[in-house]
Amino acid sequence: DLMPKGNHHNMMLDTTPEIAAITTTFIAPSKTFNLAGLQSSTIVFDTVEHKDTYVADLKRQDIARNNCFSLVATMAAYRYGEEWLDQLLVYLEDNMKFIRQYCQENIPQLHPNDPEATYLCWIDARELGMDDDELQKFMVEKAGVAFGRGEEFGKGGSGFLRLNAACPRSVIEKALRQVKDAIATL
């Protein structure tokens, strides 16, 4: 749901009948509609037999429960949230553009990516020449900004920072200004 204009997500269920026959799809309104606290999700099964097996296992473990708020909120989000989601996508894209432009103009050592989906911007900080612990310590102690750590997603994430762009522009601007000022002291 959270994809920039022009991007498209291909679901495994839409590939081939053979793959669809062994695929179970989990979806949730949590990130898209900011409903994480309601713990709501939906599962799409390929066959009734797979669904019945899964439901029986949930019941056996005594975890097959929803709350009334999550059901109503999920239905409302998917039925009536399209206009809100369209506005959110524009806002997120504008925030991503701001991050890229700010870094290009003020923090050339940092290189934000163009995300294919979601509101998390990966920023390549390898040009600073710090290992992951030094980078995190520098950002927290000198810049006063706690980024998500890229290396938590594997070796390829080393030297990268994750910035949540789903917040007011003023918060992003303040964080980037603090990073700019801290890097200027190097």
Report the location of each language-model feature.
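Conserved glycine-rich beta-strand-loop-beta hairpin in the small C-terminal domain of fold type I
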Residues: 75, 91-100, 112-125
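Helix N-cap motif at beta-to-alpha junctions
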Residues: 47-48, 127-129, 168-170
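PLP-dependent enzyme catalytic core of the Aspartate aminotransferase-like
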Residues: 138-147, 153-186
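Conserved PLP phosphate-binding loop immediately N-terminal to the Schiff-base lysine helix
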Residues: 1-14
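Short, conserved active-site loop motifs that form the nucleotide-linked donor/cofactor pocket
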Residues: 23, 110, 145
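Short helix-capping segments at alpha-helix termini
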Residues: 16-19, 105-110, 186
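Conserved core segment of the aminotransferase class I/II
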Residues: 16-93, 100-101
